Amino acid sequence: MNRRIYFQCLLLVLPLALLPAATWGKTVVRGKAGAIVELPCQSSQKRNSVFNWKHANQVKILGNQGSSSSSFWLKGNSPLSNRVESKKNMWDQGSFPLVIKDLRMDDSGTYICEVGDKKMEVELLVFRLTANPNTRLLHGQSLTLTLEGPSVGSPSVQWKSPENKIIETGPTCSMPKLRLQDSGTWSCHLSFQDQNKLELDIKIIVLGFPKASATVYKKEGEQVEFSFPLNFEDESLSGELMWQVDGASSAQSWVSFSLEDRKVSVQKILPDLKIQMSKGLPLSLTLPQALHRYAGSGNLSLTLDKGKLHQQVSLVMLKVTQVKNKLTCEVLGPIDPKMKLSLKLEDQEAKVSTQKMVQVLDPKAGTWQCLLSSGDQVLLESKADVLATGLSHQQPTLLAGALGGTAGLVLFAGLCIYCCVKCRHRRHQAQRMSQIKKLLSEKKTCQCPHRLQKTYNLL
Protein backbone atom coordinates (compact mmCIF):
# COMPACT_ATOMS: atom_id res chain seq x y z
CA MET A 1 0.00 0.00 0.00
CA ASN A 2 2.80 2.37 0.91
CA ARG A 3 4.60 1.51 -2.31
CA ARG A 4 1.51 2.33 -4.33
CA ILE A 5 1.15 5.75 -2.71
CA TYR A 6 4.85 6.45 -3.22
CA PHE A 7 4.56 5.52 -6.89
CA GLN A 8 1.59 7.86 -7.38
CA CYS A 9 3.48 10.76 -5.79
CA LEU A 10 6.44 10.06 -8.03
CA LEU A 11 4.24 10.29 -11.09
CA LEU A 12 2.98 13.71 -9.92
CA VAL A 13 6.47 15.10 -9.29
CA LEU A 14 8.06 13.74 -12.46
CA PRO A 15 6.54 16.34 -14.86
CA LEU A 16 7.95 19.14 -12.70
CA ALA A 17 11.40 17.62 -12.88
CA LEU A 18 11.21 17.61 -16.66
CA LEU A 19 10.72 21.44 -16.74
CA PRO A 20 13.89 23.27 -17.95
CA ALA A 21 13.95 25.62 -14.95
CA ALA A 22 11.99 26.48 -11.84
CA THR A 23 10.22 29.83 -11.78
CA TRP A 24 10.84 31.91 -8.63
CA GLY A 25 7.98 34.33 -9.23
CA LYS A 26 7.60 37.81 -10.69
CA THR A 27 9.03 41.06 -9.36
CA VAL A 28 7.69 44.45 -10.43
CA VAL A 29 10.15 47.29 -11.02
CA ARG A 30 9.09 50.81 -11.94
CA GLY A 31 11.29 53.40 -13.60
CA LYS A 32 11.31 56.86 -15.14
CA ALA A 33 11.95 57.51 -18.80
CA GLY A 34 15.45 58.85 -19.32
CA ALA A 35 16.70 57.47 -16.02
CA ILE A 36 18.62 54.30 -15.06
CA VAL A 37 16.94 51.21 -13.65
CA GLU A 38 18.32 48.05 -12.09
CA LEU A 39 16.47 44.75 -12.52
CA PRO A 40 17.31 42.33 -9.65
CA CYS A 41 18.34 38.71 -9.97
CA GLN A 42 19.47 36.74 -6.89
CA SER A 43 20.80 33.19 -6.57
CA SER A 44 21.90 31.05 -3.65
CA GLN A 45 24.87 29.95 -5.73
CA LYS A 46 27.52 32.60 -5.24
CA ARG A 47 30.39 31.30 -7.32
CA ASN A 48 30.78 29.94 -10.82
CA SER A 49 27.14 30.70 -11.57
CA VAL A 50 26.08 31.21 -15.15
CA PHE A 51 23.24 33.65 -15.76
CA ASN A 52 21.42 35.04 -18.76
CA TRP A 53 18.95 37.87 -19.14
CA LYS A 54 16.32 37.44 -21.85
CA HIS A 55 13.22 39.08 -23.17
CA ALA A 56 9.89 37.29 -22.86
CA ASN A 57 10.39 36.09 -26.45
CA GLN A 58 13.66 34.41 -25.37
CA VAL A 59 15.91 36.91 -27.19
CA LYS A 60 19.11 37.14 -25.18
CA ILE A 61 20.00 40.51 -23.69
CA LEU A 62 23.11 39.83 -21.60
CA GLY A 63 24.86 36.94 -19.85
CA ASN A 64 28.20 35.89 -18.42
CA GLN A 65 30.83 33.47 -19.54
CA GLY A 66 34.02 32.03 -18.07
CA SER A 67 35.20 31.11 -14.59
CA SER A 68 34.59 33.25 -11.53
CA SER A 69 38.03 34.84 -11.71
CA SER A 70 37.93 35.67 -15.41
CA SER A 71 34.21 35.82 -16.05
CA PHE A 72 32.89 38.51 -18.39
CA TRP A 73 29.55 39.38 -19.87
CA LEU A 74 28.33 38.88 -23.40
CA LYS A 75 25.51 40.83 -25.03
CA GLY A 76 22.89 39.29 -27.27
CA ASN A 77 20.97 40.66 -30.24
CA SER A 78 18.54 42.64 -28.14
CA PRO A 79 17.63 46.24 -29.11
CA LEU A 80 18.88 47.10 -25.61
CA SER A 81 22.42 45.88 -26.27
CA ASN A 82 23.94 49.38 -26.35
CA ARG A 83 22.15 50.47 -23.16
CA VAL A 84 22.62 47.52 -20.80
CA GLU A 85 25.31 46.27 -18.45
CA SER A 86 25.67 44.35 -15.19
CA LYS A 87 27.55 44.81 -11.93
CA LYS A 88 30.40 42.31 -12.12
CA ASN A 89 31.58 43.03 -8.58
CA MET A 90 28.30 41.59 -7.26
CA TRP A 91 28.38 38.28 -9.12
CA ASP A 92 30.38 36.50 -6.41
CA GLN A 93 27.66 37.51 -3.96
CA GLY A 94 25.00 35.73 -5.99
CA SER A 95 23.56 38.94 -7.46
CA PHE A 96 23.28 39.37 -11.22
CA PRO A 97 21.44 42.66 -11.85
CA LEU A 98 20.58 43.98 -15.28
CA VAL A 99 21.25 47.72 -15.52
CA ILE A 100 19.33 49.55 -18.25
CA LYS A 101 20.37 53.12 -19.05
CA ASP A 102 18.35 55.92 -20.61
CA LEU A 103 15.01 54.19 -20.12
CA ARG A 104 12.47 54.43 -22.90
CA MET A 105 8.75 53.90 -22.85
CA ASP A 106 8.97 50.81 -25.05
CA ASP A 107 11.34 49.20 -22.53
CA SER A 108 8.28 48.28 -20.48
CA GLY A 109 7.71 44.53 -20.48
CA THR A 110 8.75 41.20 -18.97
CA TYR A 111 12.41 40.30 -18.49
CA ILE A 112 13.66 36.83 -17.54
CA CYS A 113 16.79 36.06 -15.55
CA GLU A 114 18.07 32.46 -15.75
CA VAL A 115 20.63 31.25 -13.23
CA GLY A 116 21.51 27.59 -13.54
CA ASP A 117 18.24 25.67 -13.66
CA LYS A 118 16.16 28.48 -12.17
CA LYS A 119 14.62 31.57 -13.64
CA MET A 120 13.11 34.79 -12.35
CA GLU A 121 10.63 37.09 -14.08
CA VAL A 122 10.84 40.86 -13.67
CA GLU A 123 8.08 43.16 -14.89
CA LEU A 124 9.45 46.59 -15.86
CA LEU A 125 7.00 49.50 -15.97
CA VAL A 126 8.30 52.78 -17.41
CA PHE A 127 6.54 56.11 -16.79
CA ARG A 128 7.14 59.64 -18.02
CA LEU A 129 5.71 63.16 -17.93
CA THR A 130 4.98 65.19 -21.05
CA ALA A 131 4.29 68.92 -21.38
CA ASN A 132 1.99 70.43 -23.96
CA PRO A 133 2.78 72.60 -25.86
CA ASN A 134 6.33 72.77 -24.50
CA THR A 135 8.49 72.97 -21.39
CA ARG A 136 9.51 76.55 -22.24
CA LEU A 137 6.54 78.90 -22.40
CA LEU A 138 5.56 82.55 -22.09
CA HIS A 139 3.83 84.21 -19.18
CA GLY A 140 0.07 83.86 -19.59
CA GLN A 141 0.15 80.81 -21.86
CA SER A 142 -1.57 77.52 -20.96
CA LEU A 143 0.16 74.28 -19.97
CA THR A 144 -1.00 70.67 -19.72
CA LEU A 145 1.11 68.00 -18.02
CA THR A 146 0.29 64.35 -18.71
CA LEU A 147 1.40 61.13 -17.03
CA GLU A 148 2.18 58.38 -19.54
CA GLY A 149 2.85 54.75 -18.73
CA PRO A 150 1.32 51.28 -18.36
CA SER A 151 -2.11 51.15 -16.76
CA VAL A 152 -1.02 48.15 -14.67
CA GLY A 153 -1.81 48.68 -11.01
CA SER A 154 -3.85 51.88 -11.54
CA PRO A 155 -1.75 54.09 -9.24
CA SER A 156 -3.14 57.13 -7.45
CA VAL A 157 -1.65 60.35 -8.82
CA GLN A 158 -0.90 63.67 -7.15
CA TRP A 159 0.62 66.76 -8.78
CA LYS A 160 2.68 69.39 -6.98
CA SER A 161 3.75 72.82 -8.23
CA PRO A 162 7.21 74.40 -7.75
CA GLU A 163 5.71 76.08 -4.67
CA ASN A 164 5.06 72.56 -3.28
CA LYS A 165 1.30 73.02 -3.47
CA ILE A 166 -0.98 70.14 -4.46
CA ILE A 167 -2.60 71.21 -7.72
CA GLU A 168 -4.57 68.24 -9.05
CA THR A 169 -5.07 64.51 -8.83
CA GLY A 170 -5.39 62.36 -11.91
CA PRO A 171 -3.35 61.52 -15.00
CA THR A 172 -3.32 65.14 -16.26
CA CYS A 173 -2.64 68.56 -14.76
CA SER A 174 -3.78 71.71 -16.55
CA MET A 175 -2.77 75.34 -15.97
CA PRO A 176 -4.87 77.70 -18.13
CA LYS A 177 -2.74 80.79 -17.46
CA LEU A 178 0.85 80.40 -16.37
CA ARG A 179 2.40 82.74 -13.80
CA LEU A 180 6.09 83.43 -13.34
CA GLN A 181 5.85 81.55 -10.02
CA ASP A 182 4.95 78.43 -12.03
CA SER A 183 8.48 78.34 -13.41
CA GLY A 184 10.47 75.51 -11.85
CA THR A 185 10.21 71.78 -11.18
CA TRP A 186 6.76 70.16 -11.25
CA SER A 187 6.45 66.74 -9.60
CA CYS A 188 4.05 63.84 -10.01
CA HIS A 189 3.71 61.42 -7.08
CA LEU A 190 2.50 57.87 -7.83
CA SER A 191 1.26 55.49 -5.13
CA PHE A 192 0.71 51.83 -6.04
CA GLN A 193 -1.36 49.09 -4.41
CA ASP A 194 1.77 47.25 -3.30
CA GLN A 195 2.65 50.30 -1.14
CA ASN A 196 5.49 51.28 -3.46
CA LYS A 197 5.82 54.86 -4.65
CA LEU A 198 7.39 56.62 -7.59
CA GLU A 199 8.08 60.31 -8.09
CA LEU A 200 8.54 61.88 -11.51
CA ASP A 201 9.46 65.47 -12.22
CA ILE A 202 9.64 67.85 -15.14
CA LYS A 203 11.19 71.30 -15.38
CA ILE A 204 9.02 74.10 -16.73
CA ILE A 205 10.42 77.54 -17.65
CA VAL A 206 8.04 80.52 -17.83
CA LEU A 207 9.46 83.53 -19.69
CA GLY A 208 8.28 87.03 -18.88
CA PHE A 209 8.67 90.27 -16.95
CA PRO A 210 9.28 89.87 -13.20
CA LYS A 211 6.84 92.75 -12.67
CA ALA A 212 3.46 92.87 -14.39
CA SER A 213 3.47 96.68 -14.54
CA ALA A 214 5.65 99.65 -13.64
CA THR A 215 4.68 103.17 -12.58
CA VAL A 216 7.15 106.04 -12.43
CA TYR A 217 6.37 109.12 -10.30
CA LYS A 218 8.31 112.25 -11.28
CA LYS A 219 8.34 116.01 -10.84
CA GLU A 220 8.54 118.24 -13.89
CA GLY A 221 12.12 118.58 -15.09
CA GLU A 222 13.42 115.39 -13.49
CA GLN A 223 14.99 112.59 -15.53
CA VAL A 224 12.69 109.65 -16.26
CA GLU A 225 13.87 106.05 -16.67
CA PHE A 226 11.63 103.16 -17.66
CA SER A 227 13.22 99.78 -16.90
CA PHE A 228 11.93 96.46 -18.26
CA PRO A 229 13.95 93.58 -16.74
CA LEU A 230 13.35 90.08 -18.12
CA ASN A 231 13.91 86.66 -16.55
CA PHE A 232 15.70 85.43 -19.68
CA GLU A 233 18.56 86.61 -21.89
CA ASP A 234 18.96 84.04 -24.66
CA GLU A 235 15.94 84.86 -26.83
CA SER A 236 15.78 86.97 -30.00
CA LEU A 237 12.85 89.35 -30.20
CA SER A 238 11.41 92.58 -31.57
CA GLY A 239 9.67 95.20 -29.46
CA GLU A 240 7.62 98.39 -29.54
CA LEU A 241 6.48 100.90 -26.94
CA MET A 242 3.04 102.38 -27.63
CA TRP A 243 2.28 105.48 -25.53
CA GLN A 244 -1.01 107.24 -24.82
CA VAL A 245 -0.67 110.72 -23.35
CA ASP A 246 -3.10 111.56 -20.55
CA GLY A 247 -6.29 112.87 -22.13
CA ALA A 248 -5.44 111.66 -25.66
CA SER A 249 -7.91 109.51 -27.58
CA SER A 250 -5.34 107.09 -29.00
CA ALA A 251 -1.80 105.82 -28.52
CA GLN A 252 1.19 106.38 -30.74
CA SER A 253 4.44 104.52 -31.23
CA TRP A 254 7.29 106.06 -29.26
CA VAL A 255 10.04 103.60 -30.18
CA SER A 256 10.52 100.26 -31.94
CA PHE A 257 13.58 98.02 -31.63
CA SER A 258 15.00 94.52 -31.93
CA LEU A 259 17.12 92.33 -29.64
CA GLU A 260 19.56 89.74 -30.91
CA ASP A 261 22.58 88.22 -29.18
CA ARG A 262 21.76 90.45 -26.18
CA LYS A 263 22.28 93.60 -28.27
CA VAL A 264 19.55 96.19 -28.82
CA SER A 265 19.07 97.90 -32.19
CA VAL A 266 16.68 100.87 -32.35
CA GLN A 267 14.52 100.82 -35.48
CA LYS A 268 12.40 103.96 -35.13
CA ILE A 269 11.78 106.82 -32.67
CA LEU A 270 8.90 109.30 -32.66
CA PRO A 271 10.10 112.60 -34.20
CA ASP A 272 10.89 115.40 -31.71
CA LEU A 273 10.89 112.88 -28.85
CA LYS A 274 14.14 113.04 -26.92
CA ILE A 275 14.35 109.48 -25.71
CA GLN A 276 17.33 107.16 -25.34
CA MET A 277 17.38 103.36 -25.22
CA SER A 278 19.90 101.02 -23.63
CA LYS A 279 22.23 99.13 -25.95
CA GLY A 280 21.83 95.86 -24.07
CA LEU A 281 19.94 94.11 -21.29
CA PRO A 282 18.08 94.98 -19.19
CA LEU A 283 15.84 96.93 -21.56
CA SER A 284 15.48 100.56 -20.48
CA LEU A 285 14.27 103.89 -21.90
CA THR A 286 15.32 107.32 -20.63
CA LEU A 287 13.70 110.75 -21.01
CA PRO A 288 16.12 113.59 -20.14
CA GLN A 289 13.30 115.68 -18.62
CA ALA A 290 9.83 114.89 -17.36
CA LEU A 291 7.34 117.19 -19.06
CA HIS A 292 3.61 117.40 -18.44
CA ARG A 293 2.92 116.45 -22.04
CA TYR A 294 4.61 113.07 -21.46
CA ALA A 295 2.37 112.02 -18.55
CA GLY A 296 0.26 108.98 -19.46
CA SER A 297 0.55 105.22 -19.91
CA GLY A 298 2.12 102.85 -22.38
CA ASN A 299 2.35 99.21 -23.39
CA LEU A 300 5.65 97.53 -24.18
CA SER A 301 5.10 94.51 -26.41
CA LEU A 302 7.78 91.92 -27.18
CA THR A 303 7.38 89.48 -30.05
CA LEU A 304 9.17 86.11 -29.74
CA ASP A 305 8.95 82.88 -31.71
CA LYS A 306 6.74 81.44 -28.96
CA GLY A 307 4.31 84.38 -28.87
CA LYS A 308 4.05 87.85 -27.34
CA LEU A 309 4.80 89.39 -23.97
CA HIS A 310 3.28 92.64 -22.69
CA GLN A 311 4.07 95.03 -19.85
CA GLN A 312 2.18 98.15 -18.82
CA VAL A 313 4.12 101.27 -17.83
CA SER A 314 2.90 104.66 -16.58
CA LEU A 315 4.31 108.12 -15.93
CA VAL A 316 2.49 110.11 -13.23
CA MET A 317 3.13 113.80 -12.57
CA LEU A 318 1.63 116.69 -10.53
CA LYS A 319 0.61 120.03 -12.00
CA VAL A 320 -0.13 123.06 -9.77
CA THR A 321 -1.65 126.19 -11.36
CA GLN A 322 -3.10 129.49 -10.07
CA VAL A 323 -5.61 131.36 -12.21
CA LYS A 324 -7.10 134.52 -10.67
CA ASN A 325 -8.57 133.45 -7.32
CA LYS A 326 -8.37 129.66 -7.91
CA LEU A 327 -5.50 127.34 -6.92
CA THR A 328 -5.59 123.93 -8.65
CA CYS A 329 -3.60 120.74 -8.03
CA GLU A 330 -4.00 118.09 -10.73
CA VAL A 331 -2.65 114.58 -11.29
CA LEU A 332 -1.51 113.76 -14.81
CA GLY A 333 -1.37 110.08 -15.69
CA PRO A 334 -3.21 106.98 -14.41
CA ILE A 335 -3.47 106.40 -10.66
CA ASP A 336 -4.97 103.80 -8.36
CA PRO A 337 -8.48 104.68 -7.15
CA LYS A 338 -7.26 104.20 -3.57
CA MET A 339 -4.71 107.00 -3.88
CA LYS A 340 -5.46 110.41 -2.38
CA LEU A 341 -4.71 113.91 -3.62
CA SER A 342 -4.42 116.67 -1.00
CA LEU A 343 -3.85 120.42 -1.12
CA LYS A 344 -3.03 122.32 2.05
CA LEU A 345 -1.43 125.46 3.40
CA GLU A 346 1.42 124.92 5.82
CA ASP A 347 0.16 124.00 9.30
CA GLN A 348 -3.43 124.12 8.06
CA GLU A 349 -6.01 121.41 7.44
CA ALA A 350 -5.70 119.79 4.02
CA LYS A 351 -8.36 119.51 1.38
CA VAL A 352 -8.37 115.85 0.33
CA SER A 353 -9.87 114.19 -2.75
CA THR A 354 -9.83 110.75 -4.34
CA GLN A 355 -10.29 112.39 -7.73
CA LYS A 356 -7.46 113.51 -10.00
CA MET A 357 -8.00 117.22 -9.21
CA VAL A 358 -8.44 119.33 -6.08
CA GLN A 359 -9.12 123.11 -6.03
CA VAL A 360 -9.13 125.92 -3.46
CA LEU A 361 -10.95 129.24 -4.04
CA ASP A 362 -9.43 132.48 -2.74
CA PRO A 363 -6.34 130.78 -1.32
CA LYS A 364 -4.64 132.46 1.59
CA ALA A 365 -1.15 133.83 1.21
CA GLY A 366 1.65 131.39 1.91
CA THR A 367 3.25 128.20 0.62
CA TRP A 368 0.74 125.59 -0.50
CA GLN A 369 1.63 121.92 -0.68
CA CYS A 370 0.11 119.41 -3.12
CA LEU A 371 0.59 115.72 -2.22
CA LEU A 372 -0.22 112.45 -3.98
CA SER A 373 -0.16 109.62 -1.47
CA SER A 374 -0.96 105.95 -1.15
CA GLY A 375 -1.73 105.14 2.46
CA ASP A 376 1.08 106.65 4.53
CA GLN A 377 3.48 106.81 1.59
CA VAL A 378 3.92 110.13 -0.26
CA LEU A 379 4.48 109.42 -3.95
CA LEU A 380 4.66 112.98 -5.31
CA GLU A 381 4.93 116.46 -3.82
CA SER A 382 4.70 119.92 -5.36
CA LYS A 383 4.68 123.41 -3.80
CA ALA A 384 3.29 126.79 -4.89
CA ASP A 385 3.66 130.27 -3.32
CA VAL A 386 0.51 132.40 -3.14
CA LEU A 387 0.61 136.17 -2.46
CA ALA A 388 -1.88 138.06 -0.26
CA THR A 389 -5.44 137.47 -1.44
CA GLY A 390 -6.40 141.18 -0.98
CA LEU A 391 -4.23 142.05 -3.92
CA SER A 392 -5.18 139.12 -5.97
CA HIS A 393 -7.69 140.99 -8.24
CA GLN A 394 -6.27 144.57 -8.39
CA GLN A 395 -2.62 143.87 -7.90
CA PRO A 396 -1.59 144.13 -11.58
CA THR A 397 -3.45 147.47 -12.14
CA LEU A 398 -2.28 149.05 -8.89
CA LEU A 399 1.25 147.98 -9.49
CA ALA A 400 1.26 149.46 -12.99
CA GLY A 401 -0.25 152.73 -11.72
CA ALA A 402 2.22 153.02 -8.89
CA LEU A 403 5.13 152.37 -11.16
CA GLY A 404 3.86 154.90 -13.70
CA GLY A 405 3.34 157.61 -11.05
CA THR A 406 6.74 157.06 -9.55
CA ALA A 407 8.41 157.27 -12.94
CA GLY A 408 6.56 160.55 -13.72
CA LEU A 409 7.62 162.15 -10.46
CA VAL A 410 11.21 161.16 -11.01
CA LEU A 411 11.22 162.64 -14.52
CA PHE A 412 9.53 165.88 -13.36
CA ALA A 413 11.98 166.34 -10.48
CA GLY A 414 14.91 165.74 -12.76
CA LEU A 415 13.63 168.30 -15.29
CA CYS A 416 13.15 170.90 -12.56
CA ILE A 417 16.63 170.42 -11.22
CA TYR A 418 18.08 170.66 -14.70
CA CYS A 419 16.25 173.92 -15.42
CA CYS A 420 17.32 175.48 -12.09
CA VAL A 421 20.95 174.62 -12.62
CA LYS A 422 20.83 175.94 -16.19
CA CYS A 423 19.28 179.29 -15.13
CA ARG A 424 21.69 179.74 -12.27
CA HIS A 425 24.63 179.07 -14.56
CA ARG A 426 23.43 181.60 -17.11
CA ARG A 427 22.82 184.26 -14.44
CA HIS A 428 26.26 183.75 -13.00
CA GLN A 429 27.82 183.98 -16.45
CA ALA A 430 25.93 187.22 -17.19
CA GLN A 431 27.17 188.78 -13.96
CA ARG A 432 30.75 187.93 -14.86
CA MET A 433 30.40 189.41 -18.33
CA SER A 434 28.96 192.59 -16.90
CA GLN A 435 31.84 192.90 -14.47
CA ILE A 436 34.44 192.37 -17.20
CA LYS A 437 32.87 194.96 -19.48
CA LYS A 438 32.88 197.46 -16.64
CA LEU A 439 36.55 196.86 -15.93
CA LEU A 440 37.44 197.21 -19.58
CA SER A 441 35.59 200.48 -19.84
CA GLU A 442 37.46 201.84 -16.86
CA LYS A 443 40.77 200.39 -18.11
CA LYS A 444 41.40 198.75 -14.83
CA THR A 445 42.26 195.42 -16.18
CA CYS A 446 45.54 193.82 -15.38
CA GLN A 447 48.00 193.67 -18.24
CA CYS A 448 49.78 190.60 -16.98
CA PRO A 449 49.81 187.69 -19.48
CA HIS A 450 48.10 185.24 -17.12
CA ARG A 451 45.33 187.69 -16.32
CA LEU A 452 44.84 188.47 -20.01
CA GLN A 453 44.55 184.77 -20.77
CA LYS A 454 41.90 184.30 -18.04
CA THR A 455 39.96 187.29 -19.37
CA TYR A 456 40.00 185.92 -22.89
CA ASN A 457 38.81 182.57 -21.60
CA LEU A 458 35.88 184.26 -19.89
CA LEU A 459 35.01 186.04 -23.12
UniProtKB/Swiss-Prot annotation:
GO cellular component, one term: plasma membrane
Disulphide bond pairs: 41-113, 329-370
GO terms assigned for molecular function: coreceptor activity; MHC class II protein complex binding
Lipidation (S-palmitoyl cysteine): 420, 423
Subcellular location(s) per record: Cell membrane
Post-translational modifications reported in the UniProt record: Palmitoylation and association with LCK contribute to the enrichment of CD4 in lipid rafts.
Every Ig-like V-type domain range: 26-129
GO biological process, one term: T cell differentiation
Superkingdom field: Eukaryota
Record PTM Phosphoserine, positions in chain: 434, 441
Keywords: Adaptive immunity, Cell membrane, Disulfide bond, Glycoprotein, Immunity, Immunoglobulin domain, Lipoprotein, Membrane, Palmitate, Phosphoprotein, Repeat, Signal, Transmembrane, Transmembrane helix
Signal peptide as annotated in the record: 1-25
SUPFAM superfamilies listed in its UniProt record: Immunoglobulin
Ranges that cross the membrane: 397-419
One Pfam family cited in the UniProt record for this chain: Tcell_CD4_C
Intervals, Extracellular compartment: 26-396
Protein's job: Integral membrane glycoprotein that plays an essential role in the immune response and serves multiple functions in responses against both external and internal offenses. In T-cells, functions primarily as a coreceptor for MHC class II molecule:peptide complex. The antigens presented by class II peptides are derived from extracellular proteins while class I peptides are derived from cytosolic proteins. Interacts simultaneously with the T-cell receptor (TCR) and the MHC class II presented by antigen presenting cells (APCs).
Domain remarks: The Ig-like V-type domain mediates the interaction with MHCII.
Assembly information from the UniProt record: Forms disulfide-linked homodimers at the cell surface. Interacts with LCK. Interacts with PTK2/FAK1. Binds to P4HB/PDI. Interacts with IL16; this interaction induces a CD4-dependent signaling in lymphocytes. Interacts (via Ig-like V-type domain) with MHCII alpha chain (via alpha-2 domain) and beta chain (via beta-2 domain); this interaction increases the affinity of TCR for peptide-MHCII. CD4 oligomerization via Ig-like C2-type 2 and 3 domains appears to be required for stable binding to MHCII and adhesion between T cells and APCs.
Protein name (database record): T-cell surface glycoprotein CD4
Species assigned in the record: Oryctolagus cuniculus (Rabbit)
Lineage of source species: Eukaryota, Metazoa, Chordata, Craniata, Vertebrata
